[in-house]
Amino acid sequence: MGASRLAPTVCFVAPHQEDTVLRSTEVVIIGAGAAGLMCALTAAGRGRQVLLLDHANKAGKKILMSGGGRCNFTNMYTEPANFLSQNPHFCKSALARYTQWDFIGLVAKHGVPYHEKKLGQLFCDNKSSDILGMLLDECDQVGVELRLDTSIQTIEKVESGYLLDTTLGQVQCQSLVIATGGLSIPTLGATGFGYQVAKQFGHELLPTRAGLVPFTITDQLKDCLLYTS
């Protein structure tokens, strides 16, 4: 039986019993967070057939809690000179392809009200759900198929691309994007899946460490600091 091509429609549904046959698509993106949604709408906007998968029951959970619930979605001073990196050339090429002004234009297109808080930080006037809704609307307009509550069991490199065993059944694709994020906030669904896939395909893994943590001090140290200020 040949693999059937699905019509590019958005489906915000859990997998069904009949989804057990081999299906084919051009692009599979694993992870429906900010990166996965942007990747999906960009690829589909260029005419690719895109299937976006996530093991959670909702897309963009971290978007909803970001910025204290108002989503600090970009910074007006997002420039290569303001980044620290072992490979500054990557930053230059990435920001040249898509700038903060491109995203601000997308926000304006959808009529999302926002303001500058300080030092170029841009926040929604209302709620983070405005940004999530914007990304989902963009995905809808270009025909991204979103499937939630979908787990990936195995990934295999094949001649035509990649073969995935999922709770949807087998999925074959030409291009595969892993956009599952890091390990932070496991209560929102973060796992080490992306690291496992990277290791499976022979990529070098660097030790992870926290990038944003609370700073706490003891009462005794606080009293000492009062006399040094």
Where are these regions (language model features)?
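Residue-level detector of alpha-helix initiation sites
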Residues: 29, 33-34, 58, 182-184
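Glycine-rich active-site loop/strand segments that organize a redox cofactor
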Residues: 70-115
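Redox-cofactor binding/interface segments in oxidoreductases and associated redox assembly factors
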Residues: 30, 65, 178-179
